[in-house]
Swiss-Prot record:
The keyword Transferase does not apply. This is Kappa-theraphotoxin-Cg2a. Belongs to the neurotoxin 30 (phrixotoxin) family. Disulfide bonds join C55-C69, C62-C74, C68-C78. Residues 22-53 form a propeptide. Keywords: Amidation, Disulfide bond, Ion channel impairing toxin, Knottin, Neurotoxin, Potassium channel impairing toxin, Secreted, Signal, Toxin, Voltage-gated potassium channel impairing toxin. The presence of a 'disulfide through disulfide knot' structurally defines this protein as a knottin. Inhibits voltage-gated potassium channels of the subtype Kv4.1/KCND1 with high affinity and shows weak effects on Kv4.2/KCND2 and Kv2.1/KCNB1 subtypes. The toxin modifies the gating behavior of the channel and may interact with the S3-S4 extracellular loop. Negative results: does not inhibit Kv1.1/KCNA1, Kv1.2/KCNA2, Kv1.3/KCNA3, Kv1.4/KCNA4 and Kv3.1/KCNC1 potassium channels. It comes from Chilobrachys guangxiensis (Chinese earth tiger tarantula). GO terms for cellular component: extracellular region. It comes from the Eukaryota. Residues 1-21 form the signal peptide. It is found in: Secreted.
Length: 83
């Protein structure tokens, strides 16, 4: 009884995983399309500053050249300053 229940559950898990993998392949035909969609979706996160440069918002990596936007603090990536 335990063996058949395990086999049924395992079969359902494999079926769901295969179905999910097919959906992901249909959504992006190539790695370039994936990168392009990531860039286009995140483009609105960049906000122009007065100096003509762009500041980084939350979850963008930051360093001495890529500054965080006002109200954010750089801790490997930009985080909202709570205090």
């Amino acid at each position: 009884m335990k063996g058949s229940a395990f086999a049924i559950i395992l079969g359902l898990v494999v079926l769901c995983a295969c179905s999910f993998a097919e959906d992901e392949q249909d959504q992006f035909a190539s790695p370039n399309e994936l990168l392009r969609s990531m860039f286009l979706e995140s483009r609105h996160e960049l906000i122009p500053e007065v100096e003509g440069r762009y500041c980084q918002k939350w979850m963008w990596t930051c360093d001495s050249e890529r500054k965080c936007c006002e109200g954010y603090v750089c801790e490997l990536w930009c985080k909202y300053n709570l205090g």
